[in-house]
Curated annotation (Swiss-Prot):
<feature type="topological domain" description="Extracellular">
    <location>
        <begin position="487"/>
        <end position="498"/>
    </location>
</feature>
<comment type="subunit">
    <text>Homodimer.</text>
</comment>
<feature type="transmembrane region" description="Helical">
    <location>
        <begin position="430"/>
        <end position="450"/>
    </location>
</feature>
<dbReference type="InterPro" id="IPR011701">
    <property type="entry name" value="MFS"/>
</dbReference>
<feature type="topological domain" description="Extracellular">
    <location>
        <begin position="144"/>
        <end position="163"/>
    </location>
</feature>
<feature type="topological domain" description="Cytoplasmic">
    <location>
        <begin position="271"/>
        <end position="302"/>
    </location>
</feature>
<feature type="topological domain" description="Extracellular">
    <location>
        <begin position="406"/>
        <end position="429"/>
    </location>
</feature>
<dbReference type="Pfam" id="PF07690">
    <property type="entry name" value="MFS_1"/>
</dbReference>
<feature type="topological domain" description="Extracellular">
    <location>
        <begin position="324"/>
        <end position="354"/>
    </location>
</feature>
<feature type="transmembrane region" description="Helical">
    <location>
        <begin position="250"/>
        <end position="270"/>
    </location>
</feature>
<keyword id="KW-0812">Transmembrane</keyword>
<feature type="topological domain" description="Cytoplasmic">
    <location>
        <begin position="376"/>
        <end position="384"/>
    </location>
</feature>
<comment type="similarity">
    <text>Belongs to the glycoside-pentoside-hexuronide (GPH) cation symporter transporter (TC 2.A.2.4) family.</text>
</comment>
<keyword id="KW-1003">Cell membrane</keyword>
<feature type="topological domain" description="Extracellular">
    <location>
        <begin position="225"/>
        <end position="249"/>
    </location>
</feature>
<feature type="transmembrane region" description="Helical">
    <location>
        <begin position="499"/>
        <end position="519"/>
    </location>
</feature>
<dbReference type="GO" id="GO:0008506">
    <property type="term" value="F:sucrose:proton symporter activity"/>
</dbReference>
């Protein structure tokens, strides 16, 4: 009897998070009607036309991912040109985990209950896209704004010192950008589930979403690797904004254009059915109740789920050095550039950053290809073996990056002739190969942990909402740890990226062992890898 009562309590607790992130059964019926009637068209509409319309209704995901790719590849290096030291760059990224943990659940809660005539999801997509456009313009023009707020009037081609006003403007824009990204992505993904619920099914909707994210990533990294924006549009250059800064402006101008176009297409084609006020589920107690119920559910998680959370946390600890410093490593260790050095040094650094963006493009391609293979591998080898192998591969690739960085810097001295600056062709080629290969374990990172968590919670009576909620905690906490400790570690090793990659490789090796020992045997996997990692 006691076991039965305990099982009831656990089932209720596990269902709590899911209940807060979904609507009543009548709403699910409306979702199916909406999919059949709006995007799907009438009964006479061909299946091909329905799927094409559904495809373009998700176009906003590509526009958002384009901007996210620019953020990942260009903003850590750019922040250092404004005077933010290498050891404090990680602190500018601390808003990511905060936004992912706080904004997404709250936006998801209220988008499920929105009764505007535009629909449940489109109001949040519209507002989020507008904030993203404003944010990227603030970032792109931060140097010019800082000059008007009191920064040096010396020309950017000769000035090598900090520009603190510009740095503060940049940080404000960066934080707004992260919060806006999280405002859009949750409702956009939920809308695809709404619109595909009838004719196509949720797997088709999520596949289209992932495909648009892949397209956005490839185009974004191509834009970041382009060093011709300042030549095509000379007016981008100002006394406060030289070549590298002007290239950043040009890339972000295209981001605004793509976001506006993709948002307009989505707003037009995704004809949502408005939600009636009487159908709104008001039993949750408000958006903040999401977090209360989530933490209550932690008390009744199955033991296997705690092991999944631990392995997930260590896995993400191994990845953050690469995610934050990938293009900076290419600019510093491989190209021997300096973001706040002389004009020649800054140009070399910028060339390395753009080469790193090209490497991230290769990474995205490898990620997309690998995502199609992962389900078969998981069914054949089990998910935990695939997860473990991916961590050992990260360990090997991080070791190669450490070795390449050390070899590149060993014979280099800044005081030597200018002919020694720039990359060694062989080392540059190896670095690009590493960037491409790391897309393979990244595909595992963005799919397998979610699938394992979903299976473990489902076996104990929980749901997808519970799995996503608790797994977010395991991702957010290590991000905060890295953001707060990366500075002191960086200072202890004289501002290089190589030690950070060494630490990441050590965590990857530990996680590879833990995955084999701790994780349960599961063979399922999510439908497609998510191209955008982290928060």
């Amino acid at each position: 009897m006691e076991e039965g009562r305990r099982g009831d309590r656990e089932a209720k607790s596990a269902a709590g998070w899911t209940a807060l992130s979904t609507t009543k059964t009548t709403l699910e019926e409306k979702r199916r009607l909406q999919a059949n009637g709006s995007v799907g068209g009438d009964a006479g509409t061909s299946g091909f036309r329905r799927i094409v319309r559904l495809f373009f209704a998700c176009m906003v995901a590509g526009g958002i991912q384009y901007g996210w790719a620019l953020q990942l590849s260009l903003l850590s290096p750019y922040s250092q040109t404004l005077g933010i030291s290498h050891s404090y760059v990680s602190l500018t990224w601390i808003c990511g985990p905060i936004a992912g943990f706080v904004v997404q659940p709250i936006v998801g809660y209220y988008s499920d209950r929105c009764t505007m005539k535009m629909g449940r999801r489109r109001p949040f997509i519209l507002v989020g896209c507008l904030i993203i456009c404003i944010s990227v313009m603030i970032i792109g023009f931060s140097a010019d704004i800082g000059r008007h707020l009191g920064d040096t009037k010396e020309h950017c081609s000769t000035y090598t010192g900090p520009r603190w006003s510009a740095a503060m403007v940049y940080i404000v824009g960066f934080w707004f950008l992260d919060f806006a990204n999280n405002t859009v992505q949750g409702p956009a993904r939920a809308m695809m589930a709404d619109l595909s619920a009838g004719h196509h099914g949720p797997n088709v909707g999520q596949s289209i979403f992932s495909l648009w994210m892949a397209i956005g990533s490839v185009l974004g990294y191509l834009s970041g690797a382009n060093g011709k924006w300042h030549e095509w549009f000379p007016w981008l250059k100002t006394a406060a904004c030289c070549d590298a800064c002007a290239n950043l402006k040009g890339a972000f101008f295209t981001a605004v254009l793509l976001i506006v176009v993709s948002m307009t297409v989505t707003m037009y084609l995704a004809d949502e059915m408005p939600l009636d006020k009487q159908d709104v589920d008001t039993s949750g107690g408000g958006g903040c109740a999401v977090f209360v119920d989530l933490f209550k559910s932690l008390r009744n998680l199955p033991p296997a789920m705690f092991k999944v959370l631990a392995v997930t946390a260590v896995t993400w600890l191994s990845w953050f050095p690469f995610i934050q410093y990938n293009t900076d490593w290419m600019g510093r260790e491989i190209y021997h550039g300096e973001p706040q050095g002389t004009a020649a040094k800054a140009d070399v650094y910028d060339a390395g950053v753009r080469e790193g963006a090209m490497g991230l493009l290769f990474c995205s391609v490898a990620l997309g290809v690998t995502s199609f293979v992962i389900p078969k591998l998981c069914r054949r080898l089990t998910s935990k073996v695939v997860w473990s192998i991916s961590n050992f591969l990260v360990f090997a690739l991080m070791a190669v990056m450490v070795a390449v960085g050390m070899v590149s810097m060993r014979g280099y001295r800044p005081s030597l002739a200018a002919g020694l600056t720039g990359p060694d062709p062989t080392l540059k080629a190896v670095a690009l190969v590493v960037f491409a290969l790391i897309g393979i374990p990244q595909a595992v990172l963005f799919s397998v942990p979610w699938a394992v968590a979903s299976e473990v919670t489902a076996e104990e009576g929980g749901g997808q909402g519970l799995a996503i909620g608790v797994l977010n905690i395991a991702i957010v906490v290590p991000q905060l740890v890295i953001a707060l400790t990366a500075g002191p570690i960086d200072g202890a090793f004289n501002k290089g990226n190589t030690p950070a990659f060494g630490i990441g490789g050590a965590f990857a090796f530990i996680c590879g062992v833990l995955a084999l020992i701790w994780l349960p045997k599961t063979r399922g996997v999510s439908n497609a890898a998510v191209v955008a990692g982290g928060h």
